[in-house]
């Protein structure tokens, strides 16, 4: 009886640890997609960057901010 209670206790602790780890992994933010231009991954939002491997890359597109200022 003691052996089965100990085994159940260990099983319960392990399942609680796995559940906690799964929640922590699910709460990690994912990389912003370029389609979500409201997400500010660059200084001017995603529209000031370019899409590289499904993520916003902020290098090389600062000219868009200058063009926007000229337009306004």
UniProtKB/Swiss-Prot annotation:
Relay the domain remarks.
The presence of a 'disulfide through disulfide knot' structurally defines this protein as a knottin. Is completely devoid of the classical secondary structure elements (alpha-helix and/or beta-strand).
- The protein's organism comes out as Tityus serrulatus
Residue ranges listed under propeptide:
60-72
Top-level taxon: Eukaryota
Known tissue expression: Expressed by the venom gland.
UniProt record similarity statement:
Belongs to the short scorpion toxin superfamily. Potassium channel inhibitor family. Epsilon-KTx 01 subfamily.
Cystine bridges: 34-42, 37-58, 41-51, 46-56
Its function? Potassium channel blocker. At 3 uM, this toxin blocks voltage-independently voltage-gated potassium channels rKv1.2/KCNA2 (25%), hKv1.3/KCNA3 (27%), rKv4.2/KCND2 (25%), Kv10.1/KCNH1/EAG1 (15%), Kv11/hERG (12%), and Shaker-IR (10%). On hKv1.3/KCNA3, the IC(50) is 17.1 +-3.3 uM.
Keyword Secreted, does the record have it?
yes
The primary location reported for this protein is secreted
The protein's UniProt keywords, in alphabetical order, are:
Disulfide bond, Ion channel impairing toxin, Knottin, Potassium channel impairing toxin, Secreted, Signal, Toxin, Voltage-gated potassium channel impairing toxin
Tell me yes or no: is Disulfide bond among this UniProt entry's keywords. Answer: yes
User: Under which name does UniProt file this protein?
Assistant: Potassium channel toxin epsilon-KTx 1.1
Q: Which SUPFAM superfamilies match?
A: Scorpion toxin-like
**What GO cellular component term, any one, is given?**
extracellular region
Miscellaneous comment in the UniProt entry for this protein: Negative results: does not block all sodium channels tested and several potassium channels. Does not block the following voltage-gated potassium channels: rKv1.1/KCNA1, rKv1.1/KCNA1, rKv1.5/KCNA5, rKv1.6/KCNA6, rKv2.1/KCNB1, hKv3.1/KCNC1, and Kv7.2/KCNQ2. Does not block the following voltage-gated sodium channels: rNav1.1/SCN1A, rNav1.4/SCN4A, hNav1.5/SCN5A, mNav1.6/SCN8A, and DmNav1/para.
- Subcellular location, in the record's words? Secreted
Q: Name one GO molecular function term.
A: potassium channel regulator activity
Which positions carry the signal peptide feature in this UniProt record? 1-30
